[in-house]
Amino acid sequence: MHNQVVIIGGGPSGTLLALILAKANIDVLVLERMTKEYVLSRIRAGVLEWNTVDMLMKNGVGKRMSAEGQVHEGTFLSSSNKQFRIDFKNTINKQVMVYGQTEVTFDLYKELEKHKVKIIHEVDDVEIKDLTKETSFVSFKDKDGKPNIVKSKFIIGCDGFHGVSRSHIPTNKLKIFEKVYPFGWLGVLSETPPVSHELIYANHSRGFALASMRNENLSRYYIQVPNSDKIENWSDDNFWEELKLRLPTEASDTLITGPSIEKSIAPL
């Protein structure tokens, strides 16, 4: 195989870049290690800054987002059981869009299909070769275990911190700037109405909490937990009880709880 550009990683960054290149008539191939079903169902972040919204709209993937997404003109911060609102619109003339990464990725895949961009899923043993030469190579095994080699002028890594691309940066060129916190966010997704029409970021002596949403009937909540904690330690009832303690009273008094449909811990 031969492509002008090979993108490793079929998430939103890789697929948006693939779309931009395809619209510029650049031949591009996307390699993704997970199944298409997994990529289109995984739960990730749900709030988009407006420059991202503009970029999606500019590249033809904003129609469903405009119809189903929620525009927020501010957010709430709380501490010591008091909350106040930061008005984005009046302060900096900006907004944010609540529209889940799952939905963004779905829209991007649909648009890539129109442009006939090839995405190969379930690739394994990906290796990048001859990076410093005029033509580079990517080798991989497909889902049937068959070896493949792709020639390319440009190879772009969009496969994240744990992806194979990062490991190919020469050690003398790699600079790492990071702060690792001793805690993570325990997140719960539930088919319940959001507790607030805008997000609530809560500071509490027991730890941080966030009240977010995906739509008017799908809520996303987080609480800060130690990195050593396990999902098995948290029943739904325990999570809701702890969340109520950390949210301001005016929110916790109206919180509607229900069974979780997804639960995970994200390290920070």
Locations of regions flagged by a protein language model:
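Glycine-rich FAD pyrophosphate-binding loop
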Residues: A22-I43
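Beta1/beta-strand and adjacent pyrophosphate-binding region of the FAD-binding site
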Residues: M1-S13
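Active-site-adjacent segment of FAD-dependent monooxygenases/related oxidoreductases
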Residues: S41-A45, E49-H115, T132
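A conserved beta-strand/loop element that lines the FAD pocket in flavoprotein oxidoreductases
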Residues: E113-D125
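Conserved FAD-binding catalytic core of PHBH/FMO-like flavoproteins
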Residues: V126, K133-I149, K153-L268
